[in-house]
Amino acid sequence: MKSNHMQVEAICNGYVIDHIPSGQGVKILRLFSLTDTKQRVTVGFNLPSHDGTTKDLIKVENTEITKSQANQLALLAPNATVNIIENFKVTDKHSLALPKEVENVFPCPNSNCITHGEPVISSFTIKMIKGNIGLKCKYCEKTFSKEIVTAQV
């Protein structure tokens, strides 16, 4: 039995991150510090998706997603979409693209890396390795899987 009833309330203005893999929504909330915002944030976990799987969803009112946030989001949820909402209507829809690099977001997992002892910001080059996302540290030059780098988020 299919229902067209919305399971997560509509927002007037802001953005919606849709098609987040189940379980990644919490990481995105932490990464974007959405638990600290004064704006209304509506979250849905394990919602049914059209393909029969489940997904997470995040709606943020009266806020715009930044390019930096979109790049970070592409690492955690590369197949997610970002919908821009104005006056309760979707005015723009963006698919995500992996950035070439990401800076000052994730710590280097290598405990011997200079980023842990010197006043430098972390910096990773993004690479696809055998169909998986890899992040190469600018300083120690070690490459890590996306899962290892984002595990502490």
UniProtKB/Swiss-Prot annotation:
GO molecular function: metal ion binding
Protein biosynthesis in keyword set: no
Keyword Ion transport: no
Pfam families attached to this UniProt entry: PyrI, PyrI_C
One GO CC term, this protein: aspartate carbamoyltransferase complex
Top-rank taxon: Bacteria
Required cofactor(s): Zn(2+)
Cofactor note: Binds 1 zinc ion per subunit.
Keywords: Metal-binding, Pyrimidine biosynthesis, Zinc
InterPro entries: Asp_carbamoyltransf_reg_N, Asp_carbamoylTrfase_reg, Asp_carbamoyltrfase_reg_C, Asp_carbatrfase_reg_C_sf, Asp_carbatrfase_reg_N_sf
Assembly behavior: Contains catalytic and regulatory chains.
Function: Involved in allosteric regulation of aspartate carbamoyltransferase.
Entry protein name: Aspartate carbamoyltransferase regulatory chain
